[in-house]
């Protein structure tokens, strides 16, 4: 693994851990129920919609709360796409003289704060190609952590439920709550990596797997349908309703914390340590 990838993985782990625990604890202080707080913390700290759905599958949360949190993610990400490049241009050139370092820190900052992968790609391209490369790497590293976070959530809940029932928690309970589709994703990734390594798939000049047109079409259609369904289940007045107000403020406060703490982590890793190590 190259130095750039190593720093990206380190940042991903730090950001996910710190932001998840802050978002969860702050949500609980705002009197958000435990399951919704876990869904919110997972979606905000890892990768938005996918992480929210995964956490909801593990905790068995309310579908209406899940839909609300997903809606928040998708609504907030739109201004974030433009806000983050503006902040990067306004702040980073006053800290670093090297434009390349500015791009790296900006990409790391954007990759760790914007909740959706597509939003990260679009926002970081506004800054530049180097920023885009770093942002995408860090976001990919965060996405991988979905399974890790899901496992620890399941372990925590099994312990809590085991205590209440007077039974010792078992791996069987953890396995019951663990999202099995993550294993399928990992297995599919390994299979395709092996097949591509043996030259069984066509790759472009950068070594990226050439995606078949039909597969890309179905992927686009089903993702579009999924987001349309989320929108159909969302009413804008519910976003600011009294019932959801605590959840809204918890999300916004955690997102603000995410922006600040990710900036500091990216600053240290990509602005100080990486240039020192060359």
In which residue ranges do the predicted regions lie?
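Juxtamembrane boundary at the C-terminal end of a transmembrane helix
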Residues: 263-278
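Short, small-residue-biased leader/transition segments that mark boundaries at the very start
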Residues: 1-3
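Transmembrane alpha-helical segments of multi-pass membrane transport proteins and ion-pumping complexes
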Residues: 16-28, 48-53, 77-90, 117-121, ...
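Transmembrane helical segments that form the transport core of multi-pass membrane transport proteins
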Residues: 157-263
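Structural signature of hydrophobic alpha-helical transmembrane segments
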Residues: 6-17, 41-44, 105-110, 139-145, ...
């Amino acid at each position: 693994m190259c130095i750039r990838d190593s720093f990206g993985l380190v940042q991903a782990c730090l950001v996910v851990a710190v932001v998840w625990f802050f978002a969860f604890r702050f949500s609980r202080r705002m009197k958000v129920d435990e399951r919704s707080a876990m869904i919110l913390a997972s979606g905000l700290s890892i990768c938005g919609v996918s992480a929210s759905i995964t956490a909801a599958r593990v905790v068995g949360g309310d579908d209406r709360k899940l839909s609300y949190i997903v809606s928040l993610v998708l609504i907030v990400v739109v201004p974030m796409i433009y806000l983050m490049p503006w902040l990067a241009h306004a702040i980073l050139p006053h800290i670093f003289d090297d434009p390349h370092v500015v791009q790296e820190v900006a990409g790391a900052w954007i990759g760790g704060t914007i909740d959706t992968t597509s939003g990260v790609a679009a926002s970081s391209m506004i800054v530049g190609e180097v920023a885009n490369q770093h942002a995408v790497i860090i976001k990919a590293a965060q996405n991988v952590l979905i399974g890790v976070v899901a496992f620890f959530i399941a372990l925590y809940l099994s312990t809590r439920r085991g205590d209440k029932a007077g039974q010792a928690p078992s791996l069987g309970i953890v396995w019951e709550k663990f999202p099995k589709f993550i294993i399928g994703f990992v297995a599919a990734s390994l299979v395709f990596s092996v097949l591509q390594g043996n030259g069984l798939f066509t790759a472009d000049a950068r070594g990226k797997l050439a995606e078949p047109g039909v597969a890309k079409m179905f992927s686009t259609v089903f993702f579009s349908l999924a987001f349309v369904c989320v929108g159909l289940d969302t009413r804008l007045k519910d976003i600011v309703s009294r019932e959801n107000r605590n959840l809204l403020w918890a999300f916004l406060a955690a997102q603000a914390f995410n922006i600040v703490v990710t900036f500091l982590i990216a600053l240290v890793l990509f602005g100080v340590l990486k240039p020192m190590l060359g």
